[in-house]
Amino acid sequence: MNTKELIASELSSIIDSLDQEAILKLLETPKNSEMGDIAFPAFSLAKVERKAPQMIAAELAEKMNSQAFEKVVATGPYVNFFLDKSAISAQVLQAVTTEKEHYADQNIGKQENVVIDMSSPNIAKPFSIGHLRSTVIGDSLSHIFQKIGYQTVKVNHLGDWGKQFGMLIVAYKKWGDEEAVKAHPIDELLKLYVRINAEAENDPSLDEEAREWFRKLENGDEEALALWQWFRDESLVEFNRLYNELKVEFDSYNGEAFYNDKMDAVVDILSEKGLLLESEGAQVVNLEKYGIEHPALIKKSDGATLYITRDLAAALYRKNEYQFAKSIYVVGQEQSAHFKQLKAVLQEMGYDWSDDITHVPFGLVTKEGKKLSTRKGNVILLEPTVAEAVSRAKVQIEAKNPELENKDQVAHAVGVGAIKFYDLKTDRTNGYDFDLEAMVSFEGETGPYVQYAYARIQSILRKADFKPETAGNYSLNDTESWEIIKLIQDFPRIINRAADNFEPSIIAKFAISLAQSFNKYYAHTRILDESPERDSRLALSYATAVVLKEALRLLGVEAPEKM
């Protein structure tokens, strides 16, 4: 139980008109610490109690009695709580030194499954910075949900089907070079894809030719299937190399093609339930009662099924296969209307588990304010970007610590971590402008800044040869250490907020605050000096390191022991 929960619990025992949850929402942190650590505004009780808020505050303060509080005073309409810093710091340090990396573990999920649809790049196209967002947000959410007691299933729903394969086959047959593709598959396939899109703008017959080849592919034409399989296999080799760089793993690579033989069953169910309507030769599901103006287009007039039909088949397959408690789609916010339709159609089909489906949208990555586009060849490719980030990190590490033994390994952890952290510290629904120099900086609100704070603490602990005692009598009451204690105590609540909002940035911002607070503490306090507080200061340093490393792990970022 954290401090706010304790106060809410104490107050709920003497306030009849508000429950603990309602009180918790009303608690505030005073701007001036001289006014206490936490405040409860009595305004909300004035109408029910028919008394002035000042009088209510005075009565509540008088009734409060807990050893966790140094004092409780009424100041005007507020009840101000001054916490017992020594008692709370002892409790927090005891918890972290005992539980270590399992501090803040919870069992909210009771081992139920959370399916996370994430990354999902298109076959035969390069893995760009645009795909990075879905990959790192999904990976972080997987760690967060595991931390609170869920099992996760990470699904890479590959874009391995569609008219673009018709375009690619036409381009390859016209201009492709087998040896060049074998040597650099994605580079060569991207050149072909960009070229055919440019030429198709002036030559509409290329579009028709591509449609014809895609029809052949759908009908199982041997040549078309062989080329498609080749493009897919070569792309996956490259993707997996990048996923290894990012240290991201998947439980399933079932992409769009996997559901080719599962869509007719969806159409049959919709038909049996009388949900399909005829509209200009196409078959649709009307969703007006859900406030959705456009009907869901299930089958075109030429009999071709659509993207939503495939996603319906995927949703049914995943529910049947994994019996999920939550199914999360980490997909750009431009797809919001699609996912509203998906949920509404499942609801129409009578599946109440449609409520367990959540679209987790995210904003765009731009470069110098401009939108990125594979088709126009305006794209930031991840592989050279990672290499550049690692190189920049290494330059800074060599300047800071020329004697460091495993520079390459540390530079990789810092460079990759910098890119991930910068993405994840951004509120998910906001976009950001890609700036590698800012990402890899050791100053400011960056991954390397947090990693360096962790490495600095490890250096302090090595110098002191500090090993925490699980029964250690650690306690502090100074202002600088109190700021750190409050943050560490809040870590379980931070994780819950991140899970509830599908928002890793909450954890990234927490990690920045904790690193900043420790650096401030380090500047003010001689941690290694002989004093009665030395062991407690070292225990605080140790606890900070444990929580920083765990916060970074939840973001999929490594924490090097030395930098």
Curated annotation (Swiss-Prot):
4Fe-4S is among the record's keywords: no
GO MF assignments: arginine-tRNA ligase activity; ATP binding
Top-rank taxon, per record: Bacteria
Primary location class: cytoplasm
EC number: 6.1.1.19
Compartment(s) where it occurs, according to its Swiss-Prot or TrEMBL record: Cytoplasm
Catalytic activity: tRNA(Arg) + L-arginine + ATP = L-arginyl-tRNA(Arg) + AMP + diphosphate
Chain ranges for the short sequence motif 'HIGH' region as given in the UniProt record: 121-131
GO biological process, one term: arginyl-tRNA aminoacylation
Disulfide pairings: none
KW Lyase (keyword) present: no
Classification via InterPro entries: Arg-tRNA-ligase, Arg-tRNA-synth_N, Arg-tRNA-synth_N_sf, ArgRS_core, DALR_anticod-bd, Rossmann-like_a/b/a_fold, tRNAsynth_Ia_anticodon-bd
CC per GO annotation: cytoplasm
Keywords for this protein: Aminoacyl-tRNA synthetase, ATP-binding, Cytoplasm, Ligase, Nucleotide-binding, Protein biosynthesis
Segments crossing the lipid bilayer: none
One Pfam assignment: tRNA-synt_1d
Subunit structure: Monomer.
Similarity comment: family membership: Belongs to the class-I aminoacyl-tRNA synthetase family.
Protein name according to UniProt: Arginine--tRNA ligase
Organism: Streptococcus pneumoniae serotype 2 (strain D39 / NCTC 7466)
